[in-house]
């Protein structure tokens, strides 16, 4: 039986700042303190370099799920994240999307996340801190998990 692996979206699979060049100046001013509340912002993001290829590799070795959080104040975020997964990871991946503000409630061996927030630091398995010194990029994560 494959081990369970959860992967966060924002700044792990998805390059959150890449959307800023696709929003209007008016939106930047209006939402300057809450950029994740810009309507449809999550649909404007590019993948992190090597994220898609790494997801495909890891999916062959693990029972892989996408575990992300969406802001309550941005109703489009929930559907935007689903559509992003369908577009970039394919039809089979979207049925593996879990949106939760309590990541620690999920059972599994690994969680790849860039922040300790929303229960990541309390996850019962191993938290792989993406973009840290130990795991600065997808190549380092794949090397660690597959080798």
Regions found by a protein language model. Give the residues of each.
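Active-site donor-binding segments of glycosyltransferases and PAPS-dependent sulfotransferases
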Residues: 75-103
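Active-site neighborhood of HAD-like aspartate-dependent phosphohydrolases
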Residues: 1-43, 134
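Short catalytic/ligand-binding loop motif for oxyanion handling, primarily in non-cytosolic enzymes
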Residues: 14-16, 66, 73-77, 105-107, ...
